[in-house]
């Protein structure tokens, strides 16, 4: 086996069982990975030098194909939200991965998951594709070159899209598979070319290990103001985590995954993974610039045949087009990936029913209620099979697919942290106003940014609030520079009766979803629920 690159010779691929490989390239940088990727026909170049790859059948994660080994060490797993396989099935899968790798050229990256040295996890990723190696090198945190000589991984991932699982032999659903063995700290990914599976496997692993060490893992973006006032933004895909945290007046910590521990907030990653459908220089100049340069990786973005300029408006391959780029491509990004304890927690919801206010102040009990609810709404075009009506999505802790432990573990941690650090909590609707999807319009991003700025700089503490009659939270009645009618959603609807009907329907959806948590939360959290009786008056 021919090996190239800087590595720990005393702890190589043989420690993982890999043998009889054709070649193994260790810790290559972007120029070399570009070269291998283009030579193999894996990807093409954009006009400005981004590496562009298609992921074929899978243009997003496949949560139904994700499995975890069930054994004595994982009895604390949240099995209601996770699928299991036996240790024997995983071992058969592992052996078949090892056999499948024989004779192939693989790429290895030694990386850190986590910017805090106390809590980071040393991660080794073997990939079949050069562009996947560049992707994960971009998304995780790269060690100093001198650290590679002695690097010993705690977590090992092997990612081979050409592998096909056998459902009968391996105990899985299809030929596509993501399998995690927490006891052995191994992740096996096969069948999918979608690179995001790798990064989310690291996130899932950190979600499993960190709570026991006093760190709350979070599916959120984070930034910090000039006075050291950190803000975190929870939200599901498409709600604005990446967009709203990229603020030229604040330092970006990260756009997707963070831990909140004894010394503050830290990024799990060293890169960003932005949705880039309809990306424009005018609306998101920082992300646009980062996506149009050497070192960026574009997934499923259509290029003009002649000019090779990306057409970010073209969703013909998928609405889930993506751009991966190093965090330092954002001019005001943190170089440490760390920040003080948050002063503000923001929960983002893209409410396609158009009844949530653009911003609301949450009590600590309401914050836990909305965190466990994890609400947003999907509309046609974001996923296959959606009709013309909005579909509510409740993804607990704003990250249900990545939670190995019971949601109450994360909810209780958040509540304690909010209390310990006297954090202000906000719910922000980045969805629709003036009617639901199809009738109303998208909440203007200028309005959202103005309200967020007022929340983060303390201006909203000095305004008058009303209590929302449907949801019970506090809503500002006026704010300089923001049209007052937009602050109360009913004023933006022509049909007030239809608004009332829609608002009460959404309240009912919240209540129905939260029923499964009622036995696990305190009375004040149950009391923080939207009140159907009040809403029905």
Curated annotation (Swiss-Prot):
Lineage of the species this protein comes from: Bacteria, Pseudomonadati, Pseudomonadota, Alphaproteobacteria, Hyphomicrobiales
Required co-factors: Mn(2+)
Keyword Metal-binding tagged: yes
Subcellular location: Cytoplasm
Gene name tied to this protein: pckA
Source organism (scientific name): Bradyrhizobium sp. (strain ORS 278)
Protein function: Involved in the gluconeogenesis. Catalyzes the conversion of oxaloacetate (OAA) to phosphoenolpyruvate (PEP) through direct phosphoryl transfer between the nucleoside triphosphate and OAA.
GO molecular function annotations of the record: ATP binding; metal ion binding; phosphoenolpyruvate carboxykinase (ATP) activity
GO cellular component, one term: cytosol
Co-factor note (free text): Binds 1 Mn(2+) ion per subunit.
Protein name as annotated: Phosphoenolpyruvate carboxykinase (ATP)
EC number: 4.1.1.49
